[in-house]
């Protein structure tokens, strides 16, 4: 569910975007981008500037100045490269041309009607013909459609969700509001560092707070889901062993009560899974753990443990579990799916965990 939640959100956004605009709306947006792109190319060429004709649908590449007022542009081997989208305006195109050639010998507005049209491969068959892409082209209809879909789901709006890892996916309205603010939403991935000081401060503070809460030395905010966090953490453990010359340590102990992503991540990281029994109450069987750890003492890489467990229980033997694994040369990977239950009460780094994802 971790990777699905993180990536399905993007897929849903793309799907609703297509449903709202429909085939004709998307074609209109695409044609506008293409028209403005060709307008810019033609204007630059009329100013005597060399333009690369090989670039694709929305990108213009030309031999020009590497600075354009109020714009960040990519500059590579003497080429200025920029891309247009549905937010591009004719005024912006005028600014770009002005930055390269001050005295434009024509009216840029006239260029929109007289740009050089190039031949592009177009779809020959109808597309987006399904009802869902032709029924919700008004804001009210789209809003009702989204609400209809949401009402089919069970969420905290309806009642309690007993699984901790799902409860954590609640985002309060106060947290969702800033997402749409341009200061957050419109930041380009390749923006210069000196224009991201606010983001850098947020990231720095967040890392410090999370390290303090968990008791760990450092944190990476790169993984986009719990499953990706597991994979990254297990690779870090493997690299740790290898840095010490322990190239044979590839056994991962996993309790039979574990979430399915645990063994999946371990296999992806190249590890061999050794299951550990649980008692009737869902707690890890310490005797079986000790036997498995000793049997694999020279190959033991780590144990993956969820705390509190998937059963919602704080295992009183957590420190003993960590001790057994450490004594046999392994590391303790804590699945932090239920971290909300221990925040402010315990720090994973203090009771023996070596790596954790949140």
Residue ranges and their predicted role:
Residues 1-47, 52-54, 355-358:
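Active-site C-terminal subdomain of aminotransferase-like
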Residues 4-10, 81, 154-176, 222-233, ...:
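Conserved phosphate/anionic-ligand binding catalytic regions in large, soluble enzymes, centered on
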